[in-house]
Amino acid sequence: MYFLSGWPKRLLCAPRSPAEAPLHVQSDPRRAFFAVLAPARLSIWYSRPSVLIVTYKEPAKSSTQFGSYKQAEWRPDSTMIAVSTANGYILFFHITSSRGDKYLYEPVYPKGSPQMKGIPHFKEEHCAPALNLEMKKILDLQAPIMSLQSVLEDLLVATSDGLLHLIHWEGMTNGRKAINLSTVPFSVDLQSSRVGSFLGFADVHIKDMEYCATLDGFAVVFNDGKVGFITPVSSRFTAEQLHGVWPQDVIDGTCVAVNNKYRLMAFGCASGCVQVYTIDNTTGAMLLSHKLELTAKQYPDIWNKTGAVKLIRWSPDNSAVIVTWEYGGLSLWSVFGAQLICTLGGDFAYRSDGTKKDPLKINSMSWGAEGYHLWVISGLGSQHTQIETDLRSTVKEPSILLFQFIKSVLTVNPCMSNQEQVLLQGEDRLYLNCGEASQAQNPKYSSARAERMPRHEKSPFADGGLEAPGLSTLLGHRHWHVVQISSTYLESNWPIRFSAIDKLGQNIAVAGKFGFAHYSLLTKKWKLFGNITQEQNMIVTGGLAWWDDFMVLACYNLSDCQEELRIYLRTSNLDNAFAHVTKAPMETLLLSVFRDMVVVFRADCSICLYSIERKSDGSNTTASVQVLQEVSMSRYIPHPFLVVSVTLTSVSTENGISLKMPQQARDAESIMLNLAGQLIMMQRDRSGPQIREKDSHPNQRKLLPFCPPVVLAQSVENVWTTCRANKQKRHLLEALWLSCGGAGMKVWLPLFPRDHRKPHSFLSQRIMLPFHINIYPLAVLFEDALVLGAVNDTLLYDSLYTRSSAREQLEVLFPFCVVERTSQIYLHHILRQLLVRNLGEQALLLAQSCAALPYFPHVLELMLHEVLEEEATSREPIPDPLLPTVAKFITEFPLFLQTVVHCARKTEYALWNYLFAAVGNPKDLFEECLMAQDLDTAASYLIILQNMEVPAVSRQHATLLFNTALEQGKWDLCRHMIRFLKAIGSGESETPPSTPTSQEPSSSGGFEFFRNRSISLSQSAENVPPGKFGLQKTLSMPTGPSGKRWSKDSECAENMYIDMMLWRHARRLLEEVRLKDLGCFAAQLGFELISWLCKERTRAARVDNFVVALKRLHKDFLWPLPIIPASSISSPFKNGKCRAVGEQMLKSQSADPFITPEMDAGISNIQRSQSWLSNIGPTHRDTDRASSPGPQMQDAFLSPLSNKGDECSIGSATDLTESSSVVDGDWTMVDENFSTLSLTQSELEHISMELASKGPHKSQVQLRYLLHIFMEAGCLDWCVVIGLILRESSVVSQLLGIAQSSEMDGEMLQNIKSGLQAVDRWASTDCPGYKPFLNIIKPQLQKLSEITEELVQPDTFQPVTVGKTPEQTSPRAEENRGSCSHGSISQSEPGSNNVVSRKEEDTTQADEEEPLQDGAYDCSVS
């Protein structure tokens, strides 16, 4: 449709006196010239360029006689202008060219420029002509002239004495008498008796009138406010032959404008609304079609303060109407009442500082060529508001403004390829939506489709230039792809009249005054006619369309005076030699393409179907056209100009199931004709004998005749249908989509029986469903259930002009207008309409076919929300509520629980009871979420329960959710649940918490330990670091002053309740040997792990089975079991050849079976200083830097492996850089030694095997921290298990030191001893890789055994089972409460002990380099 663009322009015509101020503008029939009236002046302006050509100035003496000029009317051939004056005179001016071939303005080109050579009519078209104005005739009608209208070769004039004068353009009445309106009979319709009521008042006269050619009559407004339509009942224009009809409910008419294409009469009223009437074809009565009025909802401040409607003007293509009011303002509407623009609100009405502007007052306006410009005579400021004195400047004086518009190509060229793309055309540029529709909506579909496409057909936005990653391409941003029309073509062919885009959105064709040109988005180039004479000899009359690589256009050949249908190939030169030309008997008005058929509508009201076929003749590719069928529509179409669009479709009243052959469902089943807003369908007559199609060629077969037309809908502006087929989405692809202006949209939907059962004969097979949308539709994405459109947006720049003198600038008075893309989902409207009509089965089939759309959950939510809002807020009881039906419908989908709770969260609390009465008890829905493991949705239901139930119920359900979240490791949710439980206990549960984010927490894999990291859950949540706990939506919790009101008793009780749940979970994790989960749990929730382990040292924190624990840790931390290298028997490390290298390479392992005791002692000393304590200092940062991929480069040593099937082939030499914990100094040693030593294959193999026996670097960091934690807590048996995995002999040495220096529990030492013995037995039988390390620590084990025998009596060597008492009865929960209630959360400062965060960059690569356990376990650590 029409959209404002940029700022308006002001033409330079500053009046020197009030007599020179412009007051009226009127365009000629071709809209190339504009007559501008001042009180004593007549000026002629040219449209492009917008320049003044000639001015006639009335002498003072005659000006006093005639009075000031009032109105102007052009003769149809633009050779004369009639001007009415205030004293009842009509002045006839002749327009003549001055002195032959002279031009007022000529473009100057350099010599030899191609523009000067051989362009026919170049000067006429491209130069402003020099004209003369000469007054030829003066006619005195002796009464003030109210209106004058050009009717064919006559001028119809209405005067204030109630007379109608029919005057010839030469200024003569030809003896015809004036008609007295009081003698014209009026009635409500033409079927009433011939003698109707008369006006009957002597002072009644016509105030405004306009002739309607397609209705053959005049729409009139009388001075008493009544409106009517006067039509001659025969060809003679006399009082006896005129009859009038009027609507009885309009008494405040002010002005009128007529739409010839849609046969509409728009009457402006004093109330500020516009009433649009049409004529009933059968009775002749005036029927109200629709109203154009501002609503209080959209414009609460101004809707009833606009004053009377002052002017109404229909656009040149009759698809839009512009309205202005007495107190100022401008509004633009589509033909059937969809509002497009209004300047009484938003940035048009308010400055950036919030102050109100005076609305623009308009005295006169007229549309320019093709509707690209609106010429406006602006008046003085608003009359009913105080005018600021400093604004009395030139802008407040009457001036000529040019508003610029861009419009949809559907207004003039509604061919099918234009219906699936949004294409707007401006005066010199085109706007199209980026990307292919199907590709942008469905990336998977688009990629598959792109693979099937030939290379030359792929969209430029799919590969190469611009990318279409998904929905964002078509919907996610507001920008257009702007194509500048070739200036060479525009120079001689302005204005652009038609545009068309192909189905893939790659090629665009435009047609102006002569010829046409096309543009490729792939090559970014225009292609024009090489022979300019061929271009200038062709006028495109009926539009143009794309068929594959061909342009199909209907044109008039000027040289042969012949109507033609031409087809040009895109890839060949633009020349008539490569065109296929078919002569046509009559002028073609409309053209469209359906599959391999072309349908044209001609001026004789006939429709002709052509078949089009590609033909290859050697290197030349052409297309041939054959006539298939002609259909005469003259019986049904009163005037050919009334046809808005003609379309071939496969749509019929019977859906594809009931047709006799499947081919018929894809054929051109019917013709859709938009006749002045009435959608008429003619489908093929299949009642008679069918034609066999087996043997006949499809282009030569005889086609079935068409049935008589059937009216499908009224007030139709645009029609969308597709020729594609998709079995999964038949409802959407076989439907017919209609745009009905202010009434919204309609869809003619097919109804299919379930499972292809035979349909019932008494059931309709299609249904028309109306629905409202908030945008003006320009394209329908059938498979994606989306409507695309465009909307005007505004940008204020008045803040840039601060000087008072600059406040008169147009940039200050008007905002800058831009056009933005927009879209809307319509699926929920259709589903609702089907449910209203008890067609739930059809609604379910339709919804299931669209369930894969990414916004389908939003569709269900929208439907539920709209029905809930309407029914729950209704003032009157609803006899048959729809909400239960909608609720039952949504339960058919797995998204039911999310849909309900999201709808509730976006709805007022007062409506919840009504909602849950229909969908079910929120407690039951919460439990369903828990059963389905949908914890985020359950958390949302918890907020509902908090507001609808007592705190005890909320606590019960919150506890269930908390325990489940703990088990699943949803740490963000756990944190929110802790706060939520505290809020309930604090008595502040009235505050409705908000939903946690539904996304997966990013920190679910890792844990962060700090040196003093224990966090007391007894503290308030204000201390929680915002970076760690802050989310977009959080469960609410009292903060600030309200937190101080908590009683200490309730705080202690709540904290105890929460701590008991945390202790229980930690105990379960430890008993199930889930150390990694325990570490994540403690780090994420700030659990006091060390203090808790101290209490559980001899109970839950005791290792019962060392072998099982060892296996589980290997599995959880992706740590490979140790292996014995194949070449270990002849290892180079037995001699001292590689002693330096060996020392450095084995620092991190210190457990090689061939290391001497002296080496072992040295290495253990290094390890003791670099184990966990160094990991949290600067040294470990260096380790990270060395072992993580960084800017510094390190060598990777590769060696061929001797036995590919052997277990040792798992190791990779690249593990050296990914998994090793060698520090920077060690790398220097390695590089130096390896550069000087020549290692054999067996030596490299040995190093590789050693590296292969280590796990990921991150796992190593985590295990060392856990080792540190257990050591601090005194859980020495767990220390031994972790030390075994890391093969740290220093752990056993430390254990010995502790056992010797302090009194240790004998049971623990005995447990360690028996556990190590069990590991030794397991290693002997199942894992010999552990044997070398066990041999290394054998002396320490022997010493440990001696200490054990000293501490423990012989009778205590029996197996001991430690009882695990439940925490409910254990005094442990209370005995150390004081120690658990202090501490603070450590902020993650730059210098703090947060190591894991520094290691994050290594995560991916370290894990990828562990092929042993690849894909077996999840090791995502944040």
Swiss-Prot record:
Source domain of life? Eukaryota
- Mark the residues carrying the PTM Phosphoserine: 1014, 1016, 1018, 1036, 1171
Q: Which keywords fit this entry according to its UniProt record?
A: Cytoplasm, Guanine-nucleotide releasing factor, Membrane, Phosphoprotein, Repeat, WD repeat
User: Compositional bias of type Polar residues: which residue ranges?
Assistant: 1378-1396
Q: Where is the composition biased (Basic and acidic residues)?
A: 449-460
Q: In which tissues is it expressed?
A: Expressed in the eye lens.
Where found? Cytoplasm, Cytosol; Membrane
Q: Which family does it belong to?
A: Belongs to the RIC1 family.
Q: What does this protein do?
A: The RIC1-RGP1 complex acts as a guanine nucleotide exchange factor (GEF), which activates RAB6A by exchanging bound GDP for free GTP, and may thereby be required for efficient fusion of endosome-derived vesicles with the Golgi compartment. The RIC1-RGP1 complex participates in the recycling of mannose-6-phosphate receptors. Required for phosphorylation and localization of GJA1. Is a regulator of procollagen transport and secretion, and is required for correct cartilage morphogenesis and development of the craniofacial skeleton.
What is the protein name stated in its UniProt record? Guanine nucleotide exchange factor subunit RIC1
